[in-house]
């Protein structure tokens, strides 16, 4: 599980990814997702919330704890992109949130019809556009030097978001390990 995750990319680029195609139940394609585009509250179906808690623990125990001491801090599921994620930002440093890492799972594939992707900035002139496949997981490092934004142009963009606090995460020293 998560054998294809490249921890060096997490340290140096601010993200890494893995396919969860065989792990995410197809049921997630049938749930109702809150339209996040307007910035309103996020509602989660109780059955989906039960599965989200399980996935949050699986990601914590089988991925993040391989490398870090970590606390799981919550989860959301939405369609579109919340307004505060549309500009380059760092949730921990700019938005003063209590988490410094996210795991996003994309329910919908990025296609020509729905250009939905993440841009990661690792410096002033270095950034990466990450175009997820269906059920891809993208693990975001929110150390001080990394920022990201989400792009949603059209169509469905259903996302599962898991928030974590990783103790001692500071890539300015960690990436040289």
Regions found by a protein language model. Give the residues of each.
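Non-heme Fe(II)/2-oxoglutarate
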Residues: 1-71, 85
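Catalytic core of non-heme Fe(II) oxygenases with the double-stranded beta-helix
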Residues: 76-145, 149-151, 155-159, 165-177
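Intrinsically disordered, low-complexity segments enriched in small/polar residues
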Residues: 8-9, 13-15, 29-31, 73, ...
